[in-house]
């Protein structure tokens, strides 16, 4: 279940600043203004990296949620609370 591709608007402020810094560093390294193709490839690489990080975080959260999920006690012979509806009798 892959997460949908994020846009710059959906990035946090920190991520947007980091992307701007990457673009500035590339511009300085080239010694000229970047072309649209160069800019887009840098953005695409950064967004791909973010997507991998977010997917890993989501996977870790799912595993933690699954681990902490309620497990019924196999020792108990009968659970009244499981068999009584919350609305009561009508």
Swiss-Prot record:
Region (Disordered): 62-90
Protein name: Uncharacterized protein YjbD
Organism of this sequence: Escherichia coli (strain K12)
Source superkingdom: Bacteria
NCBIfam families given in the database record: PRK10515.1
Pfam families, alphabetized: DUF3811
Polar residues composition-biased segments: 78-90
